UniProtKB/Swiss-Prot annotation:
Name by which UniProt lists this protein: Ceramide synthase 6
Main location: endoplasmic reticulum
GN (gene name): CERS6
PTM (free text): Phosphorylated at the C-terminus by CK2. Acetylated. Deacetylation by SIRT3 increases enzyme activity and promotes mitochondrial ceramide accumulation.
Gene Ontology biological-process entries: ceramide biosynthetic process; inflammatory response; oligodendrocyte development; positive regulation of oligodendrocyte apoptotic process; sphingolipid biosynthetic process
Length: 384
């Protein structure tokens, strides 16, 4: 075991040339990041998850009810053993031939069977109230952590001159504010990892899981080898658009369509500007070129930059989805569907949609268009 640990913590991998772990031990004069500090993230992640449950029940839910957001979920499909067996064992989306066979077997018309399968697919999906509460929690956290990050960074020299991320590296003392910022972000991402399996499932579950893994690894990696200064820039930059996204979703669930559209436009502008403009030209420039000039490359430097390039790849993917949504919104006159959502249609739409009608333009009995306008979800921080 000792040999494995010695191999894993090899100084030649983690640290620049001629630097040892002994050089980064805490002293009375200076405190440096220590790997054991990160253990604190696990109990804090649990605490954040518990705070979320309390917040959603006692803060977000009353707000949703005050906005007349429905608490009821989709209509439950009537019990039918034959259809249930087909649904669970064969297919959730029967083709025309199977529908005709079931119609003869049950003496139901095809439209009734189609409706049953739609209701059955949707009956376990959460209500709009649940979605609103989830978005309000994320909005509140993202707003807080982004505000904290801005207030912290505006007092630091590396915000105004990124070369300060590498001056005297790795002998850069760890301040209390920086330590708090890092542990808070890491704890939140661990809580997302746990809650992703109980939250609303979306089509991009795998991509978001990968994103959370990369985020956790980047935060952990940059803390251990004391790249925390540039790490704070990455974190704050990727947090900048997330609160706007969740605000747009809340406006959508509350049926404030004009506000939803405005917030989505603001989100899209901030997201694309920060992820495709500022991040590569400012952050990647300093991690790839300024650090090479001032510190020089070493093994963990390559890994860190490869992870940042992977994050940039995810940024490009999500930017593509945002542009895709924006183009659809222009053609329809409003934002009406999240390309990453798992939603097929609203519960009302399931009952009223005639065969062959375009689900994106169908009008529900609630007076909304399409699929209640579910937007792009998730934070993309070191994110998103």
């Amino acid at each position: 075991m000792a040999g494995i640990l010695a191999w894993f913590w090899n100084e030649r991998f983690w640290l620049p040339h001629n630097v040892t772990w002994a050089d980064l031990k805490n002293t009375e004069e200076a405190t440096f990041p220590q790997a054991e500090d990160l253990y604190l993230a696990f109990p804090l992640a649990f605490c954040i998850f518990m705070v979320r449950l309390i917040f959603e029940r006692f803060v977000a839910k009353p707000c949703a009810i005050a906005l007349n957001i429905q608490a009821n979920g989709p209509q439950i499909a009537p019990p039918n053993a034959i259809l249930e067996k087909v649904f669970t064992a064969i297919t959730k989306h029967p083709d025309e031939k199977r529908l005709e066979g079931l119609s003869k077997q049950l003496d139901w018309d095809v439209r009734s069977i189609q409706r049953w399968f739609r209701q059955r697919r949707n009956q376990e999906k959460p209500s709009t109230l649940t979605r609103f509460c989830e978005s309000m929690w994320r909005f509140s956290f993202y707003l807080y952590v982004f505000t904290y990050g801005v207030r912290f960074l505006k007092k630091t020299p590396w915000l105004w001159n990124t070369r300060h991320c590498w001056y005297n590296y790795p002998y850069q003392p760890l301040t209390t504010d920086l330590h708090y910022y890092y542990i808070l972000e890491l704890s939140f991402y661990w809580s997302l990892m746990f809650s992703q399996f109980t939250d609303i499932k979306r089509k991009d579950f795998g991509i978001m899981f990968l994103h959370h893994l990369v985020s956790i690894f980047l935060i952990t990696f940059s803390y251990v080898n004391n790249m925390a200064r540039v790490g704070t820039l990455v974190l704050c930059l990727h947090d900048s658009a997330d609160a706007l996204l969740e605000a747009a979703k809340m406006a959508n669930y509350a049926k404030f369509q004009k506000m939803c559209d405005l917030l989505f436009v603001m989100f899209a502008v901030v997201f694309i500007t920060t992820r495709l403009g500022i991040f590569p030209l400012w952050v990647l420039n300093t991690t790839l070129f300024e650090s090479w000039e001032i510190v020089g490359p070493y093994p963990s430097w390559w890994v860190f930059n490869l992870l940042l390039l992977l994050v940039q790849g995810l940024n490009c993917f999500w930017s593509y989805l945002i542009v895709k949504i924006a183009c659809k919104a222009v053609s329809r006159g409003k934002v009406s569907k999240d390309d990453r959502s798992d939603i097929e249609s609203s519960s009302d739409e399931e009952d009223s949609e005639p065969p062959g009608k375009n689900p994106h333009t169908a009008t529900t009995t609630n007076g909304t268009s399409g699929t209640n306008g579910y937007l792009l979800t998730g934070s993309c921080s070191m994110d998103d």
